[in-house]
Amino acid sequence: QTGCYGVVNRIDTTGASCETAKPEKLNYCGVAASRKIAEGDLQSMDRYKTLIKKVGQKLCVDPAVIAGIISRESHAGKALKDGWGDNGNGFGLMQVDKRSHTPVGKWNGERHLTQGTEILISMIKKIQKKFPRWTKEQQLKGGISAYNAGSGNVRTYERMDIGTTHNDYANDVVARAQYYKQHGY
């Protein structure tokens, strides 16, 4: 089972901001840009597909959401140097921040993906507590936003991404996740 925290295809999204799309050499933004970036990461992502699906099933999180985060955080590993990114602060495919967590496992291994996904779940649960009237899907999107900028940054549904990297984190990740959902994740 992978739908404990909502169904990714039911989440509304505006996709990538132009600020996120531009460094990817795209002259357009939005959902189309997110999908194009996700497509560019698909070949690398597929190396980890079995592992992503295993962790998703184990923790009841949609594997497509995990893939969406991995694409955004590390381009499925392509943006990392010896498993590290973000000036040596982020570890692994899901970029676990060593300033807030003690990274475990290999940068591309099951323990790392489990840790990253557990951090995501903890954020979703914080958002569930903070916004009990939101739908499951809204809480999932809020949790994704909080994965980047913390639950304190999520104040309203419409503006949850203001304060995330490029002000589009959850919207971009959700659009990428919807792409991966169509590709067997």
UniProtKB/Swiss-Prot annotation:
The modification Pyrrolidone carboxylic acid is found at residue 1. One of its GO terms (molecular function) is lysozyme activity. One of its GO terms (biological process) is killing of cells of another organism. It catalyses: Hydrolysis of (1->4)-beta-linkages between N-acetylmuramic acid and N-acetyl-D-glucosamine residues in a peptidoglycan and between N-acetyl-D-glucosamine residues in chitodextrins. Keywords: Antimicrobial, Bacteriolytic enzyme, Disulfide bond, Glycosidase, Hydrolase, Pyrrolidone carboxylic acid, Secreted. GO terms for cellular component: extracellular region. Disulfide bonds join 4-60, 18-29. The keyword Flavoprotein does not apply. Transmembrane segments: none annotated. The active site is at 73, 86. PANTHER family: LYSOZYME G FAMILY MEMBER, LYSOZYME G-RELATED. Shows preference for N-acetylmuramic acid residues that are substituted with a peptide moiety. It acts only as a glycanohydrolase. This is Lysozyme g. It comes from Casuarius casuarius (Southern cassowary).
